[in-house]
Structure formats: structure tokens, C-alpha cells
């Protein structure tokens, strides 16, 4: 039997809310009118949706329409309920309406428009200060959703929209997000491979908000070391091997022992033995301008096997790495 675990913060948030806050299965969707929106151009497609830039013809305002592919009603309700609960939260994409296509009966979510520089293109070009600035903005969104009893479960560059001109960040795609209830066992088939925490890879289901902090750590590592992605596994098994090559196998086994987790036998042949590496060994001439002792200390406190050892979003914001941001000593516009 694996041993239980609970979040260090915001543990009982949902227990103190009315059931209708988190009971999305009984949620009744308030469908708006699709005729108010005209699609302008396709922005992209995901596993579960197609995304378009659109215009609200009654207000002439730009917006973004996410047309959902056929998926369980329950999953759609969960995404809508979470977006409604988080509406108005710091740096959380704003859901404006939910409509149904009259012909296909396909649901579509209408969002505020964000100038679409996705982080991925941008974040290999950012300065040290800008990396700190945007990660701080992302942490505001994570602390907000965690404080509201919600785990995002798919934090990655692709789901972070940045309007670089206006220094505006939005955390998007809440399709995998879920309500946190201590003691609940969750599906480990969430997040994108390169950003999956060790708990998912070893099939530990009683995870919590700290999963998002691992994913944030992976983003930080890829940004400061200019290595995208930082842990580049070819499949979910290889993903854990890539992590173990950096964090060490002894440390992995200590984590498994602590929670009494049985490793899938497939790992025995591929894991081998790896010593823990110092973060300094990833520093080279092309990335040294982005690396500082406080950046490495911050990274070290995020990329921990044991989810309870990772910084929370609130603790992360208090880390010295963000002092230049908190003090606002510099203006990002005049940073080289």
C-alpha cells in the first residue's frame, strides 16, 4: 500500500466552500448565443480543441474562441466550472461566455483576446530580468488557482500566453485542471511529458498543487539554461530516466521508499545508477548571463522528487530570485 500525502497549503479549501463550487458534475451550463461571434482566423489546434481569433459583432471586440472536440460532458463541465470559479483571478485567462454551435451542437468557450506570442517562441530570447518578471507573474496565477482549491495540471510554455509589448501574461488551457480534495487519488495521465512530475511517472495518485511547481521548475531550468525542454524523455519511462540522471537514482529510491511506491518493473532495466548532478554543470558561455546563485538555489527548491519538499507558489514568490522584481529596481523596458 502506498502511503498517503496531503498538500502543505490550501489543503481544505474545497471543504470550506459550498458543494456547488466544486461539484461540477451537477453544474448547469448557461449557454450564450453563438451568433454574437464571428470567427476571423485559426490560431491553432490542440488534442481537445481548435482555437480561433474571433470578433464579438455586438461590441466589435476581439476575442478567442476555443471549439471543443467531442469529449465527455463531465470534462467540459469541469473546465467551464473551474474557469468560472477563477474568473477575475490574477493572470488567469478570462472566460467571457460559453456557446453551442447550432448545427454541430459543439460547445465553444469564448475568452478574452491576448496578443498571441506564445511563450515558446519568446522565452529563449528573454533577458535575466524578464525571465524573473514573467515567472513571478506566472506564480501569481498559480498561487491564485491553488488558493481557490484548483490544480492546473498542464503548466508548460505552450499554456502561458504573453503579450510582450504590454508585459501581460495569462495562464490558459484549464482543460486538465481539477479540484483538490486531500486524500483523493487522481489520474496520473495529465500534464505534457517534459513537464510531468516524478509522482505522475511513478504512478503516485495522491498528488496535489505541488505538481504544478515541478512543471514550473522545468520551465525555469529550460529558460535559464537555454535547453528546451530541460528533461527530454522519448516516452514516459525515459522521462523518469532523464530526471534521475540529474537528480540521482539514490534520491529517487529514497522518495519511493518514503511513500512505499512500487516501481513498474520496466524501469529496472533502464534506470541504472546515476549520481546527483550539481546545477552548475549546466552553465556554459551561452547561458551564463541568465544564471545566478539565487536562480540555481530557486531551481533546486522546485525540482525535488518529493512533492512535499517543493516550494509552494507563495513561498516561491518570496525567494530572493524575485527580489529585483519585488523591489522594482529596474524597468524591464530598459533592460538589455
Curated annotation (Swiss-Prot):
Domain spans labelled Protein kinase: 37-322
Family label: Belongs to the protein kinase superfamily. Ser/Thr protein kinase family. CK2 subfamily.
Taxonomic superkingdom: Eukaryota
Organism of origin: Drosophila melanogaster
Catalyzed reactions per annotation: L-seryl-[protein] + ATP = O-phospho-L-seryl-[protein] + ADP + H(+); L-threonyl-[protein] + ATP = O-phospho-L-threonyl-[protein] + ADP + H(+)
GO biological process: aggressive behavior; chaeta development; circadian rhythm; compound eye development; DNA damage response; intracellular mRNA localization involved in pattern specification process; lateral inhibition; locomotor rhythm
Subcellular locations according to the entry: Nucleus, Nucleolus
This protein's UniProt keywords: ATP-binding, Kinase, Nucleotide-binding, Nucleus, Serine/threonine-protein kinase, Transferase, Wnt signaling pathway
Entry protein name: Casein kinase II subunit alpha
Amino acid at each position: 500500500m502506498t502511503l498517503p500525502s496531503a498538500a502543505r497549503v490550501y489543503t481544505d479549501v474545497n471543504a470550506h466552500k459550498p458543494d456547488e463550487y466544486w461539484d461540477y458534475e451537477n453544474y448547469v451550463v448557461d449557454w450564450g448565443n453563438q451568433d454574437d461571434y464571428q470567427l476571423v482566423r485559426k490560431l491553432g489546434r490542440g488534442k481537445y480543441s481548435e482555437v480561433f481569433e474571433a470578433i464579438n459583432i455586438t461590441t466589435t471586440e476581439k476575442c478567442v474562441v476555443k471549439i471543443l472536440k467531442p469529449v465527455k460532458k463531465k470534462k467540459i463541465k469541469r473546465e467551464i466550472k473551474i474557469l468560472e470559479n477563477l474568473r477575475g483571478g490574477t493572470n488567469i485567462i478570462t472566460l467571457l461566455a460559453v456557446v453551442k454551435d447550432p448545427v454541430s451542437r459543439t460547445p465553444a468557450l469564448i475568452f478574452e483576446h491576448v496578443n498571441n506570442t506564445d511563450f515558446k517562441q519568446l522565452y529563449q530570447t528573454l533577458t535575466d530580468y524578464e525571465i524573473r518578471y514573467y515567472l513571478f507573474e506566472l506564480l501569481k496565477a498559480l498561487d491564485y488557482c491553488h488558493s481557490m482549491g484548483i490544480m492546473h495540471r498542464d503548466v508548460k510554455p505552450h499554456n502561458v500566453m504573453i503579450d510582450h509589448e504590454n508585459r501581460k501574461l495569462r495562464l490558459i488551457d484549464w482543460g486538465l485542471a481539477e479540484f483538490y480534495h486531500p486524500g483523493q487519488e487522481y489520474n496520473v495521465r495529465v500534464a505534457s511529458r517534459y513537464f510531468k512530475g516524478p509522482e505522475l511517472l511513478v504512478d503516485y495518485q495522491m498528488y496535489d498543487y505541488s505538481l504544478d511547481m515541478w512543471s514550473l521548475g522545468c520551465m525555469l531550468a529550460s529558460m535559464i539554461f537555454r535547453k528546451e525542454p530541460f528533461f527530454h524523455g522519448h516516452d514516459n519511462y525515459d522521462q523518469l530516466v532523464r530526471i534521475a540522471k540529474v537528480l540521482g537514482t539514490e534520491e529517487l529510491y529514497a522518495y519511493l521508499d518514503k511513500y512505499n511506491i512500487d516501481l513498474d518493473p520496466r524501469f529496472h532495466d533502464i534506470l541504472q545508477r546515476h549520481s546527483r548532478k550539481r546545477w552548475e554543470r549546466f552553465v556554459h558561455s551561452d547561458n551564463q548571463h541568465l544564471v545566478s546563485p539565487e536562480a540555481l538555489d530557486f531551481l533546486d527548491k522546485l525540482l525535488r522528487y518529493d512533492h512535499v519538499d517543493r516550494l509552494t507558489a507563495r513561498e516561491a514568490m518570496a525567494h530572493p530570485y524575485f527580489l529585483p522584481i519585488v523591489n522594482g529596481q529596474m524597468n524591464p523596458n530598459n533592460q538589455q
